[in-house]
């Protein structure tokens, strides 16, 4: 049986490919990108947090608590994961980036089932790994902090070092598509209007 799990939306990046605009706040069909993630993610978790390092007031308007990085300096998604592990009120935390509006509706249940005895698991589709879609036990918080303090930043290397389980999401590559550029957003909006 799946326990209570805290979900954390990772919105703490610099959004350099979006011209510095906060990616999670980019409007898509009149709604901020991160709100699509909330809509898909919230039903899967018992509690939800947003990790953001700027524009926190705008994220708070969603009614979801906002947490910032404890280890500062825009050190990547691992800093947001560390913050999530630190602030979570549950033993397990699942992460998703703010720029994937169609994330799988079975993300959490599949990661939970696929983790087996591991303390962490991450998504993998038919083509590649998606390490920002990860489930972690809060006991990894200290190990993750040590990794970041050493100056390491590579998410996959950290997941490999803790023997995270790779969980296959066959036939779902399109659900992991992230919107990195304004052109990606335009294309996504066009597809949605065409449905």
From Swiss-Prot:
This chain's protein is named Molybdenum cofactor guanylyltransferase
Name the family the entry cites: Belongs to the MobA family.
Q: Which organism is it from?
A: Yersinia pseudotuberculosis serotype O:1b (strain IP 31758)
- Keywords linked to the UniProt accession: Cytoplasm, GTP-binding, Magnesium, Metal-binding, Molybdenum cofactor biosynthesis, Nucleotide-binding, Transferase
One Pfam family, please name it.
NTP_transf_3
Could you tell me which CDD domains the record lists for this protein? MobA
Cofactor(s) this protein cannot do without: Mg(2+)
- At which positions is Mg(2+) bound? 99
């Amino acid at each position: 049986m799946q326990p209570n799990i805290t979900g954390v939306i990772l919105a703490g990046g610099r959004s350099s490919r979006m011209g510095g605009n906060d990616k999670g706040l980019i409007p898509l069909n009149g709604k901020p990108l991160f709100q699509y993630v909330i809509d898909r993610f919230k039903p899967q978790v018992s509690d939800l947090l947003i990790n953001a390092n700027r524009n926190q007031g705008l994220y708070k308007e969603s009614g979801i608590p906002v947490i910032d990085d404890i280890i500062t300096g825009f050190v990547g998604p691992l800093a947001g994961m560390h913050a999530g592990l630190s602030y979570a009120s549950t033993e397990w935390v699942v992460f998703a980036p703010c720029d994937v509006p169609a994330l799988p509706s079975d993300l959490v249940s599949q990661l939970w089932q696929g983790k087996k005895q591991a303390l962490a698991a991450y998504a993998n589709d038919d083509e590649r790994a998606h390490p920002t879609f990860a489930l972690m036990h809060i006991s990894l918080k200290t190990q993750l902090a040590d990794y970041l303090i050493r100056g390491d930043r590579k998410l996959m290397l950290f997941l490999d070092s803790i023997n995270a389980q790779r969980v296959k999401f066959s036939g779902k590559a399109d659900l992991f598509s992230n919107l990195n550029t304004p052109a990606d957003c335009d294309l996504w909006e066009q597809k949605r209007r065409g449905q």
